[in-house]
Amino acid sequence: VGVLAQSMRALRPDGLFLANFFGGDTLPELRQAFALAAANATSPRISPFIDVKDAGALLQRAGFALPVVDSEKIEIVFDSAFHLMRFLREMGDTNALIKQHKGLTGKNFMMRVAEIYAEKFSEDGGVLATFEILTMTGWKPSPNQPQPLKRGSGKVDFSEVL
């Protein structure tokens, strides 16, 4: 909430806050390959990401009006799991967890991860990677903002629309 609260203070009344970042359903294929290679007894090797519901709750907690969080999944095909991991490292998305595995990851383990990834998620001559992109929008409160109408003030019966 700290960054959101700072953003709120920086905005003018009725100012728009807009942010994009990875959501909780990012890289399920890579997570599964790591878990299977370690026989399901692994420390997390991929940083956790926030889910849609929690992102919306953070916007509300920071005091934003009209908060909305949208989710979009993008699928990218990489030449191999190693190309995907290089892409993640170049993007600066390495595991930031404090309780992550501290020892060296052996070559055989990483080869097994790549093998499992290719077996389970091959597509178009490469491997599929799914990224969930969350878009957060919220407005700094202002008296000019649209307000919800009173309950029961609608002119059309909802059952007529259906």
Indicate residue ranges for each PLM-predicted region.
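C-terminal lobe and adjacent flexible extensions of AdoMet/dcAdoMet transferase-like proteins
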Residues: 62, 82-162
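A short glycine-rich, Lys/Arg-flanked "PGG" loop and its adjoining helix->strand segment in the class I
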Residues: 2-16
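Glycine-rich, phosphate-binding/catalytic loops in enzymes
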Residues: 5-7, 36, 154-155
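Conserved catalytic/acceptor-binding region of the Class I
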Residues: 14-83, 91-103
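Generic hydrophobic/packing signal
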Residues: 3-6, 20, 42, 87, ...
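Active-site phosphate/pyrophosphate- and oxyanion-stabilizing loops and adjacent acidic/basic residues
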Residues: 5, 57, 115
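Intrinsically disordered, low-complexity coil segments
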Residues: 11, 40, 121-125
